[in-house]
Amino acid sequence: MRACSRRPLAAVVAAALAAASCTIHQREQTAASLAGAPLGRSVCVLFMDGLSKAAFDHVLAAGAVPNLKREIVDRGLSYDTAVASVPSETYPNLGAMLTGLHPGHHGIPANIWLDRRLRLAESHTNIFRVHSAADFLVPDARTLYERLPRDSVAVTTPMGRGATVYAKNLVAVVASYARWDWEFLDRKTIDDVGDAYAGALDAGRIPSLAFAHLLGPDEVAHSDGPESAEFRAVLANIDRAFARLVRRLKRWRIYDRILFVLVGDHGNQSYTRTVEADELVHRALTSHPTEADCEAGNCVLVPASGPRQKTYDVGEAQIAVGAFRGAMIWLPASRPPADVPGAFAAGKRKKQKRPRGAPPPKIVMPATSDFAAALALAPEMGLVMTRGPVPGSVVVYGPRGRSEIVRDETGEGPPRYGYRVVAGEDPLGYASVPALAPFVSGAPFPADDWLFATAPTEYPDLAVQLPEFFDSPRAPDVYLSPKDGHGFRSGKAAGHGAVSRLEMVVPLVFAGPGIEPGRRPVARTADLAPTILAWLGVPFDANEMDGEDLRLLSAPLPPPPPLPPPPAGEPAEPQEPPGRER
């Protein structure tokens, strides 16, 4: 699109955004004036969509984010191995951070999922459906916003159920897609957070929670890769916008009341080799010719995108690729958990022509175990994971071996998890680590023991998280994680959704009142909700969450002093350069 043709659109968008900015200030001022007793402290979450720990460490070392380093990292508490939730996709992880529940328990197990009970297929990646995601949380899953005073703020995030002020910024999101200008959106998101603080301060309080969802890192990682100059530029832009927010908060004398949290939901892994998920399923089915015969006219042809433009017979399997590197498969013949009546019924499809008098075609899918074993032999595959024969068990298939995870819920206390290699080599590689010898014997160990023991490995915490993921009746029958360097969609530089370390380990840093700078070894991002509530002093029932309070404080915080008077106006901030265009 030529620059001159964008001017009318730019003018309309600018006017809409200016009005929205005023609205955020006014909405938060109104909400804060009506809320109950203030907490006197605040948590500001910088939710870095698509940022891995490895990528963040790289930009820190390169000096690309000096303000984040000075204001958060250098004076904060960092976790060396903060493990995201399985799968490494945005919606299940955002839900886990807001509710403290694993994706298998809060109702959104993936970006794209099927529900056999409701005969429902849901794609949260559809831009017209993104803000309906919270509708699918289970009734018992309460978000952070629902547990806090009525002064919380959520900006640009697709999941804001319970937030007092929810700025979806849909116009800005659409404009960013249209112009491919994510720097603009991330600047606006952080500036909106500042406007919300100003509005609350005008009412004599500060928001208990301000949640800024920064989309730029993930979108640019998909298009250019997390190692690219474009990716570093997006993070440098966030850094400058954050510096502007810090200046405003310090000027208003509320900076030292705020706990800053920098967290990622998943990483991104670059890939150069692409395979269609439909083709992989086709290969696995045709390795069982007596069970899925494509020559009898009973094939369901699924068009495959990409340069080859082939069609692949996938029987009645339902396949979803939510973030380019993880694939999920629902099999019609598979038996779902006992509380899920009936198998998933595929949607209506065009009937196949058959000779007069011929019997109706019938596809008989192979057993899940045979199907998964066939998939694991594909040269592109790293791991294939399925539900096990009993609830709470998972079978993991690799190219040269098979293992089993069993959750043990007997006795008192939280569940424990056992792991053993059933055949061949250990797919997760735990058996090759001498320190993990007790953990591969099949004996059950507590979840935290697994987290500490597997933190240095390629698959940290997987023995705990996979059984929890497959608890969901909406989880697939088969979950695919390809080898490094492979993805399921062409035209992308990087993706996520698999279980590799690069996709699962993210930055997690806390900086603010009562936080002693330093490092701790491990955490789960599902720990975020109880940790924030505990720091704010908001009571909660720990039994309602899978996550645990990370106990950031060595001593209780003293009561906060009275707030300063509202700001009497702000000096003009220096203008940012225009965002990059394509």
Which stretches of residues belong to each language-model region?
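Active-site nucleophile/metal-coordination loop of metallo-enzymes that catalyze phosphate/sulfate
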Residues: 25-40, 53-147, 158, 163-165, ...
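Low-complexity, glycine/alanine/valine/leucine- and proline-rich hydrophobic stretches
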Residues: 483-519
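Beta-strand elements within well-structured catalytic alpha/beta cores of enzymes
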Residues: 38-54, 71-72, 97, 148, ...
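Secreted, luminal/periplasmic, and some membrane-associated catalytic domains
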Residues: 63, 77, 87-89, 111-133, ...
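His/Asp/Glu-rich, glycine-adjacent segments
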Residues: 96, 100-228, 234, 407, ...
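A long, amphipathic alpha-helix that forms part
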Residues: 183-202, 217-259, 268-270, 284-295, ...
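Polar, surface-exposed loop/tail segments
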Residues: 382-398, 454-455, 459, 538-574, ...
